[in-house]
Each structure stands twice: as C-alpha cells, then as structure tokens.
C-alpha cells in the first residue's frame, strides 16, 4: 500500500455516514472542552477571594460579575461563586458522562463494522491466499489489529480534548504571567518533541513485534484446542501451555518497554511544571523581593496545574500510543486497500437466491489443456490435462497421495485458477459465470467442517433458521443414510453436535457432510475421499445412494480404494502431473 497520511487511513476505515458523525463528535468535544476550561478557570477567583478579599474590587472579572449580579456583600458574593462553581462542575461531569457514552458507542459500532468488513475481505480472497496464510493471522487482523486501529481513533479524540484544554489553559496563564508561562511551555514543548523523535521508532518496532507475538499466542491456542484429542492421548498438554506462556513472557517484556517509554514523560513533565513554578519562588527569594506580589500567580498556576499536567501527560502518552499501534492500523488499511472485499451487503453472494432461481441443467464437463502451479513452487502440479465428463455419469479419480487429485478437483470446483487452459460446463467457461457454477455443485471433503450448532443448521450450513426447509433436510439425511439415526435422537434435528461434531462418530460426521452437499440438490456432486472414514458396510450403503443419484447427477469421485469407484462409468489416474484414462 502506498504511503498515506493518518487522516487518509482513518477515512478508509470509516464509511461516509460515520465520517459525518465524527465531525459532529468534534463539535461536541469542543463544548466539553469549554466546560472543562470553565471548571478550572472559576477556581482562581474563589482562591483570590479567600486570600485577599480587599483586592477584589480591582479585579476585572469581579466588576463584570458585579454588573450581572449587583451584590455588595463579599460573603454573599463568595456564596454565589461557590454555588456557580458547583453548578458548572455538575453540568461539566454530566456532559462528560454523556460524551463518554456517545464516544464509546461510536467506537464500538465502528469497531464491529470494520471487523465485519475485514472478515468479508478475507472471505472473498482467493483460495490460494488461505492456503498460504495461517488462521491466526486472520484472527489477529480481525480482532487485535482492528482494536489497535480504533484505539488510535480513541486516542485522537482524547488528543483533541486535551489539546484544546491545554491551549485554553496556556492562554489563561499567559494573561496571568506571560514570561513564566512562555518559559514553562517552551521547555515542555522542546522536551516532548525531542523525546518523541527519539522513541518514535522504538515504539513502532515494539508495535510490530507485539503483532508477531500475538499471532504466535493465537496459534498456540488454536493448535492446542484443534488437536485436543491427540494432545491428550499423547500427554502433550504442557508443550502447548509452555508455548503460549513463552510467547506471553515476550509480550510482557514488550509491554514493560512500552510502560517505561510512556511513563517517563509523565514524570518528567510533572518535574518541569513544578520546577518552573517553584523556580520563580526561588528567584524571588534570592532577589529578596516581596512574595505577596506573586501569590496570585502561584495560585493561578497551582489551580491550572490540576488540569494542565494530566492533559499534557495525556497528550504525550497519546502520541506515543499512536506510534505503538500504527502497525495495526496499517495492516487494516492494507487489507481494505487490496480491494478483495466490498462494502458489507453490496455485491454479496446470495447462495440461497441462486439455488432457488436456477434451472436444473445436465451438461458435459470438459477440462481443456489445463496446467497449474502453486505459488512459490517451480514445478507444475498438473500439466496439459484434458478430461471429458459426460452429463449424468460418474467418474472416479485415483492416484497416490500427493499426485494432484485434490488439486484437480479444486480447479474444477473453481477454487483455484489455472495458469493455462479452461474448464467448460455446457460449453461455457465456469469462470465467466462462476456464481451459476457454484449453485450447481455439491462438495463433500474428506474432513468435514461442522459447527457447534444443531444437525439442522449443519446440514443447511450458512442459512438463517427461517430459510431452512426441513423436508429438504430430511431428504438429504435419508440419502446420506443418516435419517433413521437422527429420528431416533431425543431432539431430532435440533440435536447439538458439539464443536467439529465431537458428539458424533466419524462416520456420522461424514454423513452429515454428505447430507449438506445434497441439501441443494446439485447438478454435479464432488466426493473428495468422502467415504474414507466410513466402515465397509456404511460405505457401500452411501455409495449405493450416490450411484443411484448418478442417474440424475454428474458425480466426480476421488478415492484410494478401487472398490469405492468400481461402479463408476470412467476412471482417471493422476500421476506425475498428468491425467490418463484407465477405463
């Protein structure tokens, strides 16, 4: 992604409507800043009134207040001022609570929207992308990187608030003591700029390292949970716990470094502010000047410091935090900038509508001069492949492990794009009308993916409850030789099967995958070693059902056992990148 400004990057993650809302938030922040300034600036008159009431008549603010409220008695004026300050602080803090809620909802809403947009982007990336990237990277981008991006947005909001408060308070102090204010502000500004220039690269590097460690921590969890059965059988729990903990220690080291880099400025700013004010006192004492003349100035600086030091510290910490989190924002913008995804809901694939609207079509499948090489590999997996699958027939594909059988099927499915050649269905290239092709195929892999939902939801995967046709679910289950088993369950189709179907046997999981492929009544059915996990008797029953379907569907079957494909109309062998017909 080309270099973009921070503003341009933020525009990428916000829809137009939310950008307008952000502008509205800016004006709301301005109002909050005025309240914060009033809360601090009204304290000084009260302090002056308590310290030297006899000098009040010389104060411009007192004369102005006296015009509005013509009160001669100073005690009454003191009471009015106290009540006014209390009222301002009540309003200020109520408004601050309101702004906190508004900002929190704004950030949470857009955080979720951006995460959904990134998931949409990842779902639209080509299959080769997912072959080359670990799922932990995807999880990090959607969760951790998006959180970093919106932490930056939150930091910018805080920067605006504290920056405006600081400017107003500095202006206020300039009126009180010009040279002292300029001296302190100049010192703080020089220190902040120098410190930021020194630590900026270190913070960015820490942010990059943190992202890498986050991936390793997520990977340790995913691998441990994903292989929990084998892990427990082998007694290797400690390995995965130690792997996570080791990366966790590295993460702690980074956070410690960040705490040091972010914490030092806060303490030094406090030292500079206190040293500046007390330095004035020291100079006055050294010159034997009357200290009573600077009591008012000291009071003003002391009161302003209540808000000024936290604001200055927050500005410094915010700028450092933005540098640390910038790698996360950059990653989010790069994903969006790839243009793999579009706005949520626009140009989205609606498989339900396709399945309802398509007409049944029996047509030949022709693979012409097909060649394919995986990215980062030199030798082609398949070379100059030519196959014809007649409509309504079943074709078996055999070959040793790693020969390229699954790659061939992935190409015909349209998951992979060949470097040479084409695949035709009914004389039309499947890539020219891929959505129509998708609506006509059913796929049964060797390893079935199952969600921690009901049997119904797993058969009709990806559909909302109101879209599911139970009659079609039962028909698909019956065709997969699983209907009787499900009818015997207490909750029937509503039975929860656990994550990855842990409450089912291997054969039952496989048959749910078969039922899923049959739910949409596809024209072409692909079985990628789909019966490998079944016992011989069940495999024969399932294949009998598949063979019965082959009279009305085209079936392409990958298998290791020749008995699985003995009833196929044709058999092809994949060997050394070539495909030859054996029968």
Give, region by region, the residue ranges found by the protein language model.
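ABC ATPase nucleotide-binding domain helical subdomain, centered on the C-loop/LSGGQ "ABC signature"
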Residues: 424, 431, 438, 456-499, ...
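Transmembrane helix-loop-helix hairpins at lipid-water interfaces of multipass membrane proteins
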Residues: 26-91, 174-179, 186, 289-295
């Amino acid at each position: 992604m080309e270099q973009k400004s921070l503003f341009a990057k933020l525009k990428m993650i916000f829809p137009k409507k939310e950008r307008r809302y952000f502008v509205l938030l800016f004006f709301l922040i301005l109002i909050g800043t005025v309240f914060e300034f009033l809360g601090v600036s009204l304290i000084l008159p009260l302090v002056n009134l308590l310290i030297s009431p006899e000098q009040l008549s010389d104060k411009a603010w007192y004369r102005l207040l006296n015009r509005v409220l013509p009160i001669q008695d100073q005690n009454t004026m003191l009471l009015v001022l106290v009540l006014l300050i209390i009222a301002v602080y009540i309003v200020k803090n109520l408004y601050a609570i309101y702004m906190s809620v508004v900002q929190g909802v704004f950030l949470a809403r857009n955080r979720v929207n951006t995460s959904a947009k990134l998931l949409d982007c990842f779902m639209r990336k080509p299959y080769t992308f997912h072959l080359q990237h670990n799922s932990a990277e995807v999880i990090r981008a959607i969760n951790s990187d998006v959180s970093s991006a919106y932490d930056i947005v939150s930091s910018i909001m805080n920067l605006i608030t504290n920056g405006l408060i600081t400017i107003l308070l500095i202006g206020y102090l300039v009126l009180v003591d010009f040279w002292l204010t300029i001296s302190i502000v100049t010192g703080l500004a020089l220190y902040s700029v120098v410190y930021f220039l020194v630590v900026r690269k270190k913070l960015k590097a820490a942010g990059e390292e943190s992202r890498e460690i986050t991936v390793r921590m997520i990977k340790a969890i995913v691998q441990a949970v994903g292989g929990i059965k084998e892990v427990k059988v082998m007694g290797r729990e400690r390995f995965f716990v130690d792997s996570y903990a080791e990366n966790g220690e590295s993460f702690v080291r980074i956070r410690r470094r960040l705490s040091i880099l972010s914490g030092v400025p806060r303490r030094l700013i406090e030292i500079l502010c206190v040293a500046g004010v007390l330095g004035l006192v020291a100079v006055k004492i050294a010159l034997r000047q009357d200290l009573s003349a600077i009591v008012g100035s000291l009071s003003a600086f002391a009161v302003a410091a209540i808000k000024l030091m936290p604001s200055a510290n927050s500005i410094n910490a915010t700028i450092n935090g933005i540098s640390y989190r910038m790698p996360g924002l950059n990653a989010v913008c790069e994903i969006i900038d790839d243009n793999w995804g579009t706005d949520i809901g626009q140009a989205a694939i609606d498989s339900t509508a396709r399945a309802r609207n398509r007409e049944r079509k029996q047509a030949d499948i022709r693979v012409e001069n097909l060649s394919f090489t995986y990215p980062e590999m030199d030798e082609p997996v398949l070379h100059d492949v030519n196959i014809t699958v007649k409509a309504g027939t079943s074709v078996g594909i055999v070959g040793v492990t790693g020969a390229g059988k699954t790659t061939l099927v992935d190409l015909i499915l349209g998951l992979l794009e060949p470097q040479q050649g084409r695949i035709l269905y009914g004389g039309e290239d499947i890539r020219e009308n891929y959505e129509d092709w998708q609506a006509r195929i059913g796929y049964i892999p060797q390893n079935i993916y199952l969600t921690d939902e009901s049997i119904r939801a797993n058969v009709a995967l990806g559909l909302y409850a109101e879209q599911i046709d139970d009659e079609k679910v039962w028909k698909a289950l019956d065709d997969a030789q699983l209907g009787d088993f499900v009818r015997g369950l207490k909750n029937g189709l509503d039975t929860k099967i656990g994550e990855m179907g842990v409450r089912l046997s291997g054969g039952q999981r496989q048959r749910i995958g078969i039922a899923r492929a049959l739910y949409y009544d596809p024209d072409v059915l692909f079985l990628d070693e789909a019966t490998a996990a079944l016992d011989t008797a069940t495999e024969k029953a399932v294949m009998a059902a598949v063979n019965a379907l082959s009279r009305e569907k085209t079936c392409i079957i990958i298998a290791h056992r020749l008995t699985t494909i003995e009833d196929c109309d044709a058999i092809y062998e994949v060997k050394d990148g070539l495909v030859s017909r054996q029968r």
